[in-house]
Amino acid sequence: MEQEDFYFPDTDLDLSFTSTTTDRTFASSSARTSLTLSFNDRLSTSSAVTTSSTSSSSVNHRRHDPHWSAIKSAKLLSSDGNIHLRHLKLIRHLGTGNLGRVFLCNLRDSSARFALKVIDRNCLTTEKKLSQVETEAEILSLLDHPFLPTLYARIDESHYTCLLIDYAPNGDLHSLLRKQPGNRLPIQPVRFFAAEVLVALEYLHAMGIVYRDLKPENVLLREDGHVMLSDFDLCFKSDVVPTFKSRRYRRSSSSPSLRRRRSGCFSVAAEKKYEREEIVSEFAAEPVTAFSRSCVGTHEYLAPELVSGNGHGSGVDWWAFGIFLYELLYGTTPFKGESKEQTLRNIVSTTKTASFHMDGDLDEARDLIEKLLVKDPRKRLGCARGAQDIKRHPFFDGIKWPLIRHYKPPEEVRGLVIKKSTRPHASHVIAVSPRRRKSFLWRALSYLLRGKSSSGGSKNQSNSNYYHYVGKSYASRKRV
């Protein structure tokens, strides 16, 4: 449940209440803060200050969002056609990050709510942090994906940079984990959240963006229960060359008859496995040439090549994805030590590996994590073909990736409040196989034809029987 809203005094330029002092490390609302070190990498010197607003025409999947209508109305009422701080009303503080603070706000005379990230540039003591502000603003302006935030406006006034983005009322995944028994999630919600995070990382890598700060604290949850990655100040960009190839591979899967008895594509059941060979055409866009020497991220999520300082690429995101999966399942990270230094030693140690105590039906999760936590990035899953290799793993078997946005979020997660939607979810739509659906249609047709030669009452009865069969089939496969 949301906290009771309260409003800050009206202000245009005075944002002193948002500032953090320069004589201490920024506080963080999350349990773990990110670090930033440098191994002689080149810093960006770009620090241009502008006032801009992203156009809804450049954000195709959100162009009909009512938030854009509110933004457009506010811009029409503005003398210069831009969004300013005077158009916003701050409601309450949401959290504090590495660079600034985040507030819940809305546009005046509008119920549309946003998150406003406020950065006091006077409190950023290094050129590196100033560069990170520009990096985050630039990357946010490029994003157009349902599992990533939309930048509605950037506001630069006085020594403040403000980024107006989506508000996620369900908080972050780290806070949600703390509400669960044992600080961990059942396998069905883990598969749901992991699949959406994987798709978000795939999009970033296709844009040539290496994220470098994946952790539950940075996975926000929208009002509909779907994920939204946040905090892009530690990203770096690289060139990427998309490829489209046909390839043959062997895939382990459950038999079709048993798979139809699953309660949902994110559920787990003891099923007979068999091998089948497929030839598929794949699109891949992994920034394999990406390279950086910066040591940035969160200690428990740092990849071995990143800790060593010898340089790293996009593989650090797939290592972090393996740590992310492990934490969702276990409530802790696999290499955590008694201190940050011990954690880093465990990560780079050639003898220290992740320990597992999983049930027999979770062997697929263990296998995926082990392949992601390979300390040699050249052998790590995902480093060659990106997310495509990970999507084919049996852990994600049964997921219809083009329909991922329409799957119903898990309802059994404690503390997750999902806004009801009238839109049908894919977990219901794909529950009946095409063969079974065809059988229902033929059966319905036979009832209708039989009804023409009988009384009207029989016709009505035949229709009711048809809906009975369809409804029964859907109900028997609906996820609990």
Swiss-Prot record:
BP-aspect Gene Ontology terms: auxin polar transport; auxin-activated signaling pathway; cotyledon development
Gene3D superfamilies given in the database record: Phosphorylase Kinase, domain 1, Transferase(Phosphotransferase) domain 1
Localization annotation: Cytoplasm, Cytosol
Keywords, comma-separated and alphabetical: ATP-binding, Auxin signaling pathway, Cytoplasm, Developmental protein, Growth regulation, Kinase, Nucleotide-binding, Serine/threonine-protein kinase, Transferase
EC class: transferase
Reported phenotype of the disruption mutant: Enhanced root waving when grown on agar plates.
GO molecular function terms noted in the UniProt entry: ATP binding; kinase activity; protein serine kinase activity; protein serine/threonine kinase activity
CDD domains membership: STKc_phototropin_like
Active site: residue positions: D213 (proton acceptor)
Binding site for ATP: L94, G95, T96, G97, N98, L99, G100, R101, V102, K117
Tissues showing expression: Expressed in root tips, lateral root primordia and emerging true leaf primordia.
Catalytic activity, reaction form: L-seryl-[protein] + ATP = O-phospho-L-seryl-[protein] + ADP + H(+); L-threonyl-[protein] + ATP = O-phospho-L-threonyl-[protein] + ADP + H(+)
Protein kinase domain residues: 88-396
Record-stated family: Belongs to the protein kinase superfamily. Ser/Thr protein kinase family.
Miscellaneous: Over-expression of WAG1 induces a basal-to-apical shift in PIN1, PIN2 and PIN4 localization, resulting in the loss of auxin gradients and strong defects in embryo and seedling roots.
Job of this protein: Serine/threonine-protein kinase involved in the regulation of auxin signaling. Acts as a positive regulator of cellular auxin efflux and regulates organ development by enhancing PIN-mediated polar auxin transport. Phosphorylates conserved serine residues in the PIN auxin efflux carriers. Phosphorylation of PIN proteins is required and sufficient for apical-basal PIN polarity that enables directional intercellular auxin fluxes, which mediate differential growth, tissue patterning and organogenesis. Acts as a suppressor of root waving.
Stated name of the protein: Serine/threonine-protein kinase WAG2
Organism: Arabidopsis thaliana (Mouse-ear cress)
Gene that specifies this protein: WAG2
